Amino acid sequence: MAKKAKGNRVQVILECTEMKDSGMPGTSRYITTKNRKNTTERLELKKYNPILKRVTVHKEIK
């Protein structure tokens, strides 16, 4: 069996930061990919949160 090569693209999970701080039940998460070579630090994107019904900051979790 051939060994699978590790690519530069990895799948990451983005989680809403404002949802955790508010104490409301539920969580808003998105799955996306990033290039490990070009983006070494953690991703931080503005995405829509359907529970809060507005755009919030989503950070990469491990």
From Swiss-Prot:
Name of the protein this chain belongs to: Large ribosomal subunit protein bL33
GO molecular function terms noted in the UniProt entry: structural constituent of ribosome
Pfam families xref list: Ribosomal_L33 (PF00471)
One annotated Gene Ontology cellular component of this protein: cytoplasm
PANTHER family found in the cross-reference section: 50S RIBOSOMAL PROTEIN L33, CHLOROPLASTIC, LARGE RIBOSOMAL SUBUNIT PROTEIN BL33C
The keyword Transport is assigned to this record: no
Keywords, sorted A to Z: Ribonucleoprotein, Ribosomal protein
Family designation: Belongs to the bacterial ribosomal protein bL33 family.
BP-aspect Gene Ontology terms: translation
Alphabetical list of InterPro entries matching this protein: Ribosomal_bL33, Ribosomal_bL33_sf, Ribosomal_zn-bd
